[in-house]
């Protein structure tokens, strides 16, 4: 071997020695499996190109509230990508995430959004068109349990907000409306993907209250000949949020790559992947490209209608809150 060959061999050997093998754990909520399977591959390629290091991202999925509890109880997540800010706040309250986490990334650390829609069987046999149709006698509703599922809490508050707007902001009438809706719920799964499987795979229920991305996935991937989406007249702006888990990344020395992993969600490639997986992108150019996918509807926010997640959680989903009250048969 000539001296150039020897030199190249040594250079390649030294490069491989210097390259790190890094593992991250992303603890996420229920229906983000497909999104992060694609995104993880893209980020790994990006990080390899930028640094030469190999990064493998493992995923964990479940109801957002249950996932937050697992991180509180010690699972070593480098990042969390959860359904709502309250679940990240709960981890921060235990000291595992900085309490100012929501200010660390743009758009209140919510790189994409969604909303709540209805999935019905082809032909819409029960003629479901808006929230008021879900309380009619004989309509079987599928939604997850708000005690464990972030998506279910968005579902619940979307229904409550609709009822407020149609009853002069009367809270008692809104509670009666949501109680009537939940009387029609046939199965309460622990997470959003479980509810989708109940409706799609097991054939139970007339209507699934769902994340928009789940409804689009079900129709586009599982058969437009079997299901159709009903977009209600109004719904809630759902903002899934993300954060590094400070205590874990400091311990594992993965802070730089974990932060880059979340920041890359805001990049054009990250936003494109979000849109392809039926999440509403924040990036204006990407949003324009996919505007035909996402119908326009009146959206209200958690802050406008419920005073933010801390107040909403206490009022509706804490022990003895409105969900417990309406659940008493």
Residue ranges and their predicted role:
Residues 1-7:
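Bacterial N-terminal signal peptides that target proteins for export
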Residues 14-16:
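N-terminal signal peptide c-region/cleavage motif recognized by signal peptidases
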Residues 116-124, 239-256, 273-277:
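A bilobed periplasmic-binding-protein/Venus flytrap-type ligand-binding module shared by bacterial periplasmic
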Residues 91-106, 217-231:
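Ligand-binding "clamshell"
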Residues 249-329:
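Extracellular/periplasmic juxtamembrane helices and adjacent flexible linkers that interface
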Residues 19-94, 104-105, 211:
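Early extracytoplasmic/lumenal segment of secretory-pathway proteins
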Residues 92-165:
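A conserved helix-loop-strand patch within extracytoplasmic ligand-binding domains
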Residues 166-233:
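Ligand-binding pocket segment of bilobal, Venus flytrap-like solute-binding proteins
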